[in-house]
């Protein structure tokens, strides 16, 4: 089922022996457009802190009661490694937390051993790096952060550029709540298209300038403007998704 990230904020996380806390934000992998962690703000049953939980621990999502059940106890969460979620999560921290919960690594061969085309404008593994890319990668490695783990909260508000100009800002994300992959970005167009909201797929992203907070897609303003109308009050079904893909000839 397709669901927006914003609709999941505030959901109660229910452990095997009681409530753990509330959903605050999500971290996604910008190479595969997959949710890697949900950030949970714990409740009053122990000193308040924020923790990361992987979809590996998810058991049941109940949209009626707005609860997400996980296969973890309160005690397990309480004793989890401390992670400063307001700072970039390092690879070492990921290894620590995944080891603590016995979650497998991702990307197939270890965390980063999977070849292919990334969703956000570059290959999964830089086979041929430019000098600038090499310097950036080494700098990020020295800073100990995972350069491909992004916060949905951080990316919300990024400018969306087409091949011929700006069309709006990222407002939300549409995910599949089974695979936990991001299928679409919701774009608030403001005055560009008379306030119309449009959705774009990560597959259409040509380039991302993270420092400038700009996402560029490989379609024109006119193409986006005339795309099948998106109704935010209705869930995205297969019929709409097919019509959208047919329109963009993807």
Sequence positions of predicted segments:
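Peripheral interaction segments used for macromolecular assembly
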Residues: 1-250
């Amino acid at each position: 089922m397709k669901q927006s990230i914003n609709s999941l904020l505030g959901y109660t996380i229910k452990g095997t022996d009681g409530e753990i806390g509330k959903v605050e934000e999500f971290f996604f992998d910008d190479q595969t457009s997959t949710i890697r962690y949900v950030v949970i703000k714990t409740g009053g049953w122990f000193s308040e802190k924020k923790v990361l939980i992987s979809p590996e621990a998810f058991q049941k999502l109940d949209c009626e009661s707005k609860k997400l059940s996980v296969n973890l106890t309160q005690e397990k969460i309480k004793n989890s490694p401390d992670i400063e979620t307001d700072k970039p999560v390092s690879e070492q921290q990921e290894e620590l937390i995944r080891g603590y919960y016995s979650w497998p690594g991702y990307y197939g061969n270890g965390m980063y051993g999977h070849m292919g085309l990334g969703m956000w404008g570059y290959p999964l593994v830089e086979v041929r790096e430019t000098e600038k890319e090499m310097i950036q990668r080494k700098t990020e490695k020295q800073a100990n952060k995972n350069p491909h783990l992004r916060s949905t909260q951080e990316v919300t508000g990024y400018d969306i550029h087409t091949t011929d100009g700006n069309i709006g800002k990222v407002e939300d994300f549409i995910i599949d709540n089974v695979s936990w992959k991001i299928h679409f970005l919701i774009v608030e167009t403001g005055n560009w298209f008379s306030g119309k909201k449009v959705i774009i797929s990560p597959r259409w992203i040509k380039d991302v300038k993270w420092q400038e907070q700009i996402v560029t897609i490989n379609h024109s303003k006119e193409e986006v403007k005339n795309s099948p109308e998106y109704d935010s009050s209705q869930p995205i079904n297969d019929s709409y998704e097919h019509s959208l893909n047919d329109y963009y000839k993807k």
